[in-house]
């Protein structure tokens, strides 16, 4: 087995991009501190929803490294749900090793709702309270990318 060139360590999520059809943006006088506003207690139409599995800072870096031709691996923690399977499948499709992924029975994989309006996005986040465990590589990788965990 060849050593890993690039190891990414960080949380993985499934993003559900919700393309909003109707909303408004209100900013202060300096055009900063903007807020997205929608009717309260109403049914709000949206254009579409698209789920993307296996994303986040670490996964995005691992995919980039793999596409550059490096032997890439992801070290992360996931739940025991279907979203974990989707993330692992996405990694394998991109040629990323999944040998360093820890599954937690009874937990869900991190899932974010991304409210996408015009050219901006607002992300609703919920991170699972994993008791993080990591499977170290049997050889030191050439490069390690460490990013957010549980944040």
Regions found by a protein language model. Name each.
Residues 2-4, 9, 69-71, 96, ...:
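Short coil/turn connectors at secondary-structure junctions
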Residues 1-75:
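Glycine-rich phosphate/adenosyl-contacting loop at the front of the ribokinase-like
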Residues 25-26, 90-93, 117-120:
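Short, hinge-like loop/turn segments at secondary-structure boundaries
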Residues 99-104, 112-151:
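Conserved phosphate-binding/catalytic loop of the ribokinase/pfkB sugar-kinase fold
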